[in-house]
């Protein structure tokens, strides 16, 4: 119902060399895309969809009349849906490095002597590289300015990078369940996932296709680890609890709990459709993402007293040190105070760097977070909002109450879907209107 129907992917070849951030060059590359809706005469109704880690170009519709699995964002894209294909021309592109048709590790390396796949020789790519190829795609489609660039999770990072790198080429930026950069904890999760693949004996240093093997066990474990971070404790408790698959303990290492069965199923299904080398480079692209890297503010530490108001430093320290404090107590208090000041300084520097990264952007923003998302918590979205507001950018923010954790951005949640639709359909604000329109939709919670 309200589907875009059967869609046919298109493959576009780019003959020009592509220099990547890692200083390596692809001699040529291909991008596979899907489009939905009709581009209007002045090409002002185009919306770009950026996919997440395991996503692809197939965001909506079906590949045949018998296809039972719709695109990964079919509840968002279609006639009269949040991204209305009666109104917009929607483009979803599969990024290079993926395993769903665009040039990646499973593609033939044109520089190999025996027409072998790239495998581990495919260069590491970044969010910035992806956005660069998407801009090249825009040129090929003769779309000068996108009505909006939209993405969830890693797709949201691409939308942010678009705003920073091509400020005049998009009017709206929709960032959903995302973050300005990965935390140490998130990098750690990615490293555990990578090591599960790298340590699989069938990985063969990434040349498993040539060896006729496949690191299936490693990829299964990697997906199991990742999937846990997409869910919430409450959701897992409600769905599985401590339910046993057979109703009794089997006193062995086979699947006993329902949650074990679920995770293994998710891992096995993923391993059948995804490439291990692609998983490795996708997670590294996540780790590398940091739109503030191009700004020296992130490298220059400022004195604490220039970041925290003098009266705050004085009052907080004096009030916490009593006249009869022992030398040890005094030392501890001073140390605790220094820790607090260091945190304040760090937060200030992060905000300053983000402000610098987005100060030159020209688009309007919608930032969406979900209350139960602990992979990219609402606080991370609020960092983006704070930086945008501090630079006077027009930004709307909504923190949606949803039980699905990080995966909430894939669910049909009325308040969330309504916010996206309203934002995309609203008239573009002039500069004068923008100055008076900074708003946050929904309370911070």
From Swiss-Prot:
It is found in: Cytoplasm. The active site is at residues 153, 373, 406. The keyword Acyltransferase applies. GO terms for molecular function: homoserine O-acetyltransferase activity; homoserine O-succinyltransferase activity. It is an enzyme of class 2 (transferase). GO terms for cellular component: cytoplasm. Residues 45-411 form the AB hydrolase-1 domain. Substrate binds at residues 223, 407. Pathway: Amino-acid biosynthesis; L-methionine biosynthesis via de novo pathway; O-succinyl-L-homoserine from L-homoserine: step 1/1. It comes from the Bacteria. Keywords: Acyltransferase, Amino-acid biosynthesis, Cytoplasm, Methionine biosynthesis, Transferase. It catalyses: L-homoserine + succinyl-CoA = O-succinyl-L-homoserine + CoA. One of its GO terms (biological process) is homoserine metabolic process. Pfam families: Abhydrolase_1. The record marks 375 as: Important for acyl-CoA specificity. Belongs to the AB hydrolase superfamily. MetX family. Homodimer. Transfers a succinyl group from succinyl-CoA to L-homoserine, forming succinyl-L-homoserine. This is Homoserine O-succinyltransferase.
């Amino acid at each position: 119902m309200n589907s875009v129907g059967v869609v046919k992917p298109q493959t576009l070849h780019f003959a020009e060399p592509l220099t990547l951030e890692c200083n390596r060059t692809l001699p040529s590359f291909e991008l596979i895309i899907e489009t939905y809706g009709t581009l209007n005469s002045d090409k002002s109704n185009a919306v770009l969809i950026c996919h997440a880690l395991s996503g692809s170009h197939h965001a909506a519709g079906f590949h045949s009349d018998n296809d039972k699995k719709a695109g990964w964002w079919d509840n968002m894209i279609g006639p009269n849906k949040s991204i209305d294909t009666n109104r917009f021309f929607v483009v979803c592109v599969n990024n290079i490095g993926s395993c769903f048709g665009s040039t990646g590790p499973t593609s033939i390396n044109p520089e190999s002597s025996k027409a072998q796949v790239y495998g581990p020789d495919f260069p590491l790519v970044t969010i910035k590289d992806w956005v660069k190829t998407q801009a090249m795609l825009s040129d090929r489609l003769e779309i000068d300015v996108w009505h909006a660039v939209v993405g969830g999770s890693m797709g949201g990072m691409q939308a942010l990078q678009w705003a920073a790198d091509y400020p005049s080429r998009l009017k709206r930026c929709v960032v959903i369940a995302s973050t300005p950069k990965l935390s140490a904890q998130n990098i750690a999760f990615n490293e555990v996932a990578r090591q599960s693949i790298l340590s699989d004996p069938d990985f063969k240093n990434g040349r498993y296709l040539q060896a006729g093997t496949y690191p299936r066990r490693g990829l299964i474990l990697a997906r199991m680890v990742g999937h846990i971070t997409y869910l919430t404790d409450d959701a897992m408790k409600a769905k599985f609890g401590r339910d046993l698959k057979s109703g009794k303990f089997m006193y062995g290492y086979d699947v006993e709990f329902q949650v074990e069965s679920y995770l293994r199923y998710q891992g096995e299904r993923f391993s059948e459709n995804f490439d291990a080398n692609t998983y490795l480079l996708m997670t590294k692209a996540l780790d590398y993402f940091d739109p503030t890297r191009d700004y020296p503010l992130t490298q220059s530490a400022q004195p604490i007293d220039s970041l925290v108001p003098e009266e705050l430093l004085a009052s907080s320290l004096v009030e916490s040190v009593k006249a009869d404090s022992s030398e040890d107590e005094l030392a501890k208090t001073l140390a605790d105070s220094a820790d607090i000041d260091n945190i304040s300084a760090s937060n200030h520097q992060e905000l300053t760097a983000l402000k610098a990264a987005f100060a030159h952007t020209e688009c309007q923003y919608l930032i969406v977070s979900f209350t139960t998302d602990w992979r990219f918590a609402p606080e991370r979205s609020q960092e983006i909002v704070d930086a945008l507001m501090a630079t006077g950018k027009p930004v709307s923010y909504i923190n949606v109450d949803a039980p699905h954790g990080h995966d909430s951005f894939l669910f049909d949640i009325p308040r969330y879907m309504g916010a996206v639709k309203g934002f995309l359909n609203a008239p573009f604000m002039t500069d004068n209107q923008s100055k008076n329109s900074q708003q946050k939709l929904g309370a911070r919670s």
